[in-house]
């Protein structure tokens, strides 16, 4: 595979890669949290008509069968009741209770358990990556926050209320797809296109052309996210306090400005390392790598809750 291409590793290759990373990083602790990728998970919100004193568990399983694209016997299911907002109105006088449903494919869970055991971690807690991302960026100050996570092949929008996930929206758009667009249009190898994308400077004479090709991959996704945010604010009566942009593909010059234009909101490039201590001379490095480490740091912080 070329630099920047999305890749799916075989089990043995995953084991070797994980062991190598742990060894080279000189990590001494033997505890971990596993952040399950969304590709092996499912997260959604449902609204259930029920009185406040009614047990929702059996109703949630009924609703889960409707929305989860797999048999419930094939997934590990979890759920939590959430409050959409203080200004939420009852629909037609009915008592509606909002529930967040999360499910992980059992076969994926089993594969990753074996991977963790191979690396010496015995039954680490597991959560879906969206929850790690929110933990990594939620400061406790924001009532309502949004996160745009720009990945290799998909870009996700998370909306959180008091640090709890309320909405998620995913679109096929990402850094690897942007590189493919540059490669195809300029008739250059994928590796050369990736190198050009990650090293280009605003002063480069080809920057405008590269940026146009790059941004074309995200235009529709960012417009969709803007619509989802506006619908959420209209439904809940809430105002999104802050929008974080995270993910390894978030650092291309001008992506934050493009997102700001689409969402009509100020954008903060994610820096989860504000939650931990590090030497002052590493400040610039932490800011540069922050968007790529949001999930990892957020997962690690789970052990300190």
For each predicted feature, which ranges?
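N-terminal phosphate-binding loop and adjacent alpha-helix
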Residues: 1-23, 206-213, 283-287
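Glycine-rich phosphate-binding loops at beta-strand->alpha-helix junctions
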Residues: 238-268, 273-274
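Phosphate- and other anionic-substrate recognition elements at nucleic-acid/protein interfaces
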Residues: 10-38, 58-61, 263, 267
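Glycine-rich phosphate-binding/hydrolytic loop that grips phosphoryl groups
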Residues: 132-135, 176, 250, 268-305
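Active-site neighborhood for divalent-cation/phosphate handling
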Residues: 35-138, 274-278, 295
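Short glycine-rich phosphate-binding loop at a beta-alpha junction
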Residues: 18, 25-39, 116, 121-125, ...
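Adenine-nucleotide phosphate-binding core of ATP-dependent small-molecule kinases
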Residues: 195-242, 249
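Small-residue (GG/TT-enriched) beta-loop-alpha framework at ligand/catalytic clefts
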Residues: 26-28, 34, 93-195
